[in-house]
């Protein structure tokens, strides 16, 4: 039997923790941040709102899982404007999380991986003209599901801010619907 936590622990992340499922509260204000265009992905891809579904859909989907894991990648920056350091940390996180999602989907086909930032599988998304090329591989972000990432981290026992001149990318993976995957019972990661 596979252990999803073990996969995450050995997946190249800096921090891994059990996800506090009660912290998964979709918030309208997070969706409003998406709609404001801060990341320029709202209404531009299948993995982001409005294409990824309503907050009600997100709440129902997340409530159907019993367990989850949080994974973080932390990067040290030269200064607050170290764009190369931010990009390198983001790429390291996205690569590690894509690998974790791939492995988890093999073990738990109906798991829900929620990444940091928008899906980047395709150079250009087909939204809204054509169907998604890879609907089974597509990754929505925690924010697309209305989650306030800092709150989810804190309620799950992880820091969100690691001090000056650092950047942290956080993703989560929800799993274990009723008898849907092969995961061992929760265990202490400390």
Predicted regions and their residues:
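Catalytic cores of enzyme domains
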Residues: 14-45, 49-190
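Short, extreme N-terminal leader segments that mark the start of a protein/domain
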Residues: 1-20
């Amino acid at each position: 039997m596979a252990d999803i936590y073990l996969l995450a622990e050995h997946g190249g992340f800096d921090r891994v923790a059990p996800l506090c499922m009660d912290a998964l509260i979709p918030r309208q204000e997070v969706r409003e941040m998406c709609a404001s265009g801060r990341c320029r992905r709202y209404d531009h891809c299948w993995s982001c709102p409005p294409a990824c579904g309503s907050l009600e859909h997100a709440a129902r989907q997340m409530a159907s899982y019993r367990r989850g894991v949080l994974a973080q990648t932390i990067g040290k920056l030269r200064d607050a404007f170290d764009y190369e350091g931010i990009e390198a940390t983001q790429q390291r996180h996205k690569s590690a999380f894509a690998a974790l999602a791939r492995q988890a989907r093999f073990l738990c086909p109906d798991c829900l991986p929620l990444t940091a930032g928008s899906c980047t599988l395709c150079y250009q998304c087909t939204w809204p003209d054509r169907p998604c090329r890879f609907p089974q591989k597509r990754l929505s972000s925690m924010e697309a599901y209305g989650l306030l990432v800092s709150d989810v981290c804190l309620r799950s026992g992880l820091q969100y801010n690691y001090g000056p001149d650092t950047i942290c990318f956080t993703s989560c993976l929800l799993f274990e619907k009723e008898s849907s995957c092969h995961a061992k019972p929760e265990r202490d990661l400390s």
